[in-house]
């Protein structure tokens, strides 16, 4: 019991990947998320709620901070973040490590009336820049690589107008911060509903964990609607069950390989 707070609650990845291996098919991740939500730190929850409200700013600050940190002596940055973590808490201030890259390029909208997909570039790829096999900076990160693949394969895409303010909500979901999660999921699903023309176009994300976050977000909202509405959706209510989420790797394998000349 004494060790469970750390080994059971604090360090669980809450991604549910253990469920397929569980002999009784239990999703321990969902349980841990609920327990974290019930025992959330109020200050941290408030901070993450504000972060959800101002995510466009937070996203840019994170990327620029990493770029700036790379130019300073490591002991200075590492020591500063350690002090800040002790004062504000581990959930509020991330720890800085020497092998972290510089910040990535900002996400930008992309319009195309003939789009075949809606591309959802993950904010993690704008916060963290790309690296090559030796750990050195590479201007081509996962987002840029997928865009290049689309261009080579002739796949038309669009990126939502307010993409800079959006996130898959995994940080809030995994930490159990329900208020921030609701703010972000509401923003993302409404934007994707509009960008996909009401679910006509598939959504493709360039980070696997973020694809999972988008899918969980969609399912949670559908479950909430099912509890509220017995006889179907009310008129004008978006039917988010029509949204289709795909990981970029799987989408490329299924829909782009035969269009590429290697």
Q: What would you call each of these model-derived segments?
A:
Residues 1-7, 255, 259:
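Active-site-adjacent structural elements in folded domains
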Residues 1-5, 17-20, 41-50:
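Short beta-alpha connecting loops at secondary-structure transitions
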Residues 1, 11-38, 213:
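Iron-sulfur cluster-binding cysteine motifs and their immediate structural context
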Residues 28-262:
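Iron-sulfur cluster-binding electron-transfer modules in prokaryotic oxidoreductases
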Residues 7-10, 16-20, 166, 201-205:
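Cys/His-enriched microdomains
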């Amino acid at each position: 019991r004494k060790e469970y707070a750390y080994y059971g609650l604090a360090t669980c990845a809450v991604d549910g990947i253990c469920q397929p291996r569980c002999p009784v098919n239990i999703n321990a991740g969902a349980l841990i998320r609920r327990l974290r939500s019930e025992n959330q730190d109020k200050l941290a929850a408030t901070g993450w709620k504000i972060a959800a409200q101002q995510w466009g700013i937070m996203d840019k600050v994170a990327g620029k901070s990493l770029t700036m940190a790379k130019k300073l002596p490591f002991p200075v940055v590492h020591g500063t973040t350690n002090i800040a973590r002790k004062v504000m808490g581990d959930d509020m201030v991330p720890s800085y490590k020497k092998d972290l890259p510089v910040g990535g390029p900002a996400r930008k909208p992309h319009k195309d009336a003939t789009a075949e997909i809606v591309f959802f570039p993950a904010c993690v790829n704008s916060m963290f820049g790309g690296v090559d096999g030796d750990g050195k900076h590479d201007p081509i990160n996962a987002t840029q690589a997928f865009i290049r693949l689309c261009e080579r394969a002739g796949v038309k895409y669009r990126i939502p107008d307010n993409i800079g303010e959006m996130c898959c909500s995994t940080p809030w979901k995994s930490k159990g911060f329900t208020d921030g999660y609701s703010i972000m999921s509401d923003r993302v699903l409404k934007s994707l509903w509009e960008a996909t023309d009401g679910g006509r176009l598939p959504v493709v994300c360039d980070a696997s964990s973020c694809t999972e976050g988008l899918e969980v977000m969609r399912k949670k909202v559908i479950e909430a609607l099912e509890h509220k509405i017995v006889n179907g959706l009310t008129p004008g209510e978006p039917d988010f069950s029509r949204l289709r989420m795909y990981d970029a790797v799987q989408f490329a394998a299924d829909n782009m390989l035969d269009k590429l000349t290697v």
